[in-house]
């Protein structure tokens, strides 16, 4: 008999029902559960899949470059970045009639195209790319890297090239390699690219391989570096009248600390960015030489952790046992990596709009909105994943003997205190915030808006003032003209910062009021509740008073049968599942807030946000309803327009989202009966009965149906908001 899917589980392969397919897909990446898995093979599989991941990333970015070079308008966009709409790629659709062809033929194209709202044009322009040939070259190079990654992944699965377990567990060497080799060297290389290619490019000098060694990035070359006169590299920066991409108003500095934004491009100074990457490179190159490898010098991670005795003995045995616990658990390591990456991704969202690094991206409002929303959603999924793998660690890898009385064990010991405090914070935030919103709603409804409860966010305003925002009149630190910090700031460090903070044309420290105070606390409610569910799921993953033997049932189980009441919905997987709904909900509020605040800022009517955001009806009517009008108008009696694709996606997103509830609410028996009826009818229908199943059709398990429901809910939710966001922003600002 031929080997049936899944090959990694003979038990599943012999299952006579369709469960074989679904469980096979569900456990395909759970290497630990596969037949004949050893620790060595587990690490080698993970290592090889990393190369596969890299290959996919390189292929994807190569595709972006290739399609823009082939079907885009990069060269004409470069000549006029503020007025030419960047094209992502062409559209070929046999359904398009003449009105559709006309509606989607934009940006100087000959036929229908998609407009790029990803910011790649601004990114490539900023780093020195100027022609389609440059884009093709980049696409080919990334294609080559993709192939190299695939070969490397295959190679490391061959017997001769398989790394050993000890190699994977050599934490110090890996730290040194990642810190110095990846972060340090790549940051240094990026500084080199910025100084040698991007900065000359911004000054009208086209540097490529043919003239790379002839064009000096700085008139004095390496002289100042070797003579210690590093300040020369900061002298004569670009002037405020500099036209990006030309020599007009250009300086000669390569590493500066100007602060603020380039007046024409509204983005950070390239010379500041180069300086930043050089500093990062230096820090990481040093950090990557701190840990002890085969040379016998430097820190040992284990010694560091063991030596750390908490003051006053308040934390038991501190970090003893942690080194081996973390180093022997891929789930713990993945949890830490995901937590870090999730936070970084959210920080990217926050900083890409407030401190834009790419030329002219700040004036492309739809791109700004799309990138913020994109990075916040990605961050949400990554962060929830961190807790999921933390819970799996507690179930599969945690050893109570090894961690006696250390910080990890003590977390588990006082989990009731942690969970109840989080619960209290969530309840407090929820009831008070909702109470204020609803009170204000009622006052508006009764025609007495002056009776609203409006709270000024004075602490946040004070913090903004301390950073130099003068409009609140706090007169403190950087907003006080008498303070030493203010005076030093005018000359020594970041002279452009204070101008940028107090200019109302950017997104640095936006003016905040009672509406911001309320939505801030609504978001805090969402964050605390999501955290509560995730933390409880992880801390109760091994067991609870209700179910002390929970860890024996694994990460995802529906219930312990009918004889044991109350054991449904309490697996660690169920906590993750519930938390994802809250995560999506919270990011919904975050993106609504960001988008509405910015739409009113860009349109010059900030009072609309300030007045309408203090009560729920304001959000529903003046943000959601008012801004969905363009969407609902995508198709009308006069034909169609370029927003019609978003109108369709808006409807389709709602459909996918609503489909999710079909899986989330109906139970298993209902589907089993329906499937059996359909199978009966199928087998008795001419032509249809020529096709038979090899597997007996059975309904999804409870956990699987929840996953399918959650996937539809998430995808539909994000599709719907993406269509709303892009249509409402591009409909207003082009």
Swiss-Prot record:
UniProt: phylloquinone binding residues: 671
Top-level taxon of the source organism: Eukaryota
Keywords tagged on the record: 4Fe-4S, Chlorophyll, Chloroplast, Chromophore, Electron transport, Iron, Iron-sulfur, Magnesium, Membrane, Metal-binding, Oxidoreductase, Photosynthesis, Photosystem I, Plastid, Thylakoid, Transmembrane, Transmembrane helix, Transport
Group of enzyme by EC: oxidoreductase
One GO BP annotation of this record: photosynthesis
Cofactor annotation comment: P700 is a chlorophyll a/chlorophyll a' dimer, A0 is one or more chlorophyll a, A1 is one or both phylloquinones and FX is a shared 4Fe-4S iron-sulfur center.
InterPro entries according to UniProt: PSI_PsaA/B, PSI_PsaA/B_CS, PSI_PsaA/B_sf, PSI_PsaB
Assembly mode: The PsaA/B heterodimer binds the P700 chlorophyll special pair and subsequent electron acceptors. PSI consists of a core antenna complex that captures photons, and an electron transfer chain that converts photonic excitation into a charge separation. The eukaryotic PSI reaction center is composed of at least 11 subunits.
Protein name as annotated: Photosystem I P700 chlorophyll a apoprotein A2
Protein's organism: Platanus occidentalis (Sycamore)
